């Protein structure tokens, strides 16, 4: 099978429909790792989700952007996959004493997204776009956006992701990450050599965005 991340940690998406079409034409199944793509199933003007693109199975980490408890995820299966067989394999590789706390949180989050998912993630995308514009206006930072899309290596971009390039202010991403945590009490997702990633969720408010933007402006000084 072919395994595709959709999207990557930074929000980059491949041409998933083309990958699925090519793989299926050769009798190969496609599995999508959508650990950071739960919202793609509910958002408008977002990259295509795995199952809509024709993937055969997709693992979605509801706890990352869907609101369920940590460790809880859902495995989606398409028509070409025998769900009973998948269930048998899962039963062989995991505990038979499932956590009903985690299962309950999945069901509660599923219901919440079914009822309010579109409006919730539209608000997330709006907050991310606001943050992107504000951060880029500071100078020295670059918050990635749809301007990266080139139709090939970067086919689409997940606008709910707030990935920011920091090297031009003279600090590595991990340094900015540490400063935000230690000096401003702001815990973001991660920092690497060049970037930071702030994960905006359905639980965030515009005040949280303002705090982050203000802290980044202060750090740049």
Predicted region positions:
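Conserved C-terminal alpha-helix-loop-beta "cap" of PLP-dependent enzymes
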Residues: 130, 136-221
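Conserved PLP-enzyme active-site core in the AAT-like
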Residues: 1-148
């Amino acid at each position: 099978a072919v395994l595709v991340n959709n999207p990557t940690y930074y929000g980059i998406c491949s041409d998933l429909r083309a990958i699925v079409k090519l793989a299926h034409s050769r009798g190969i199944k496609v599995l999508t790792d959508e650990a950071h793509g739960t919202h793609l199933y509910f958002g408008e003007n977002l990259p295509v989700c795995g199952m809509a693109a024709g993937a055969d199975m997709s693992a979605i980490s509801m706890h990352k952007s869907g609101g369920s408890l940590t460790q809880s995820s859902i495995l989606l299966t398409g028509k070409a996959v025998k769900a009973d067989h998948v269930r048998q394999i899962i039963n062989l590789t995991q505990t038979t004493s499932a956590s009903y706390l985690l299962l309950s949180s999945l069901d509660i989050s599923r219901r919440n997204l079914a009822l309010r998912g579109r409006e919730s993630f539209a608000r997330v995308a709006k907050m991310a776009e606001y943050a992107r514009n504000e951060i880029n206006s500071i100078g020295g930072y670059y918050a990635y956006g749809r301007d990266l899309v080139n139709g090939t290596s970067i086919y689409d971009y997940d606008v709910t992701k707030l990935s920011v390039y920091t090297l031009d202010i003279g600090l590595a991403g991990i340094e900015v990450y540490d400063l935000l945590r230690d000096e401003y009490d702001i815990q973001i997702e991660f920092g690497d050599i060049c970037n930071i990633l702030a994960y905006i969720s359905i639980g965030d408010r515009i005040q949280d965005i303002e705090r982050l933007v203000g802290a980044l402006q202060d750090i740049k000084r």
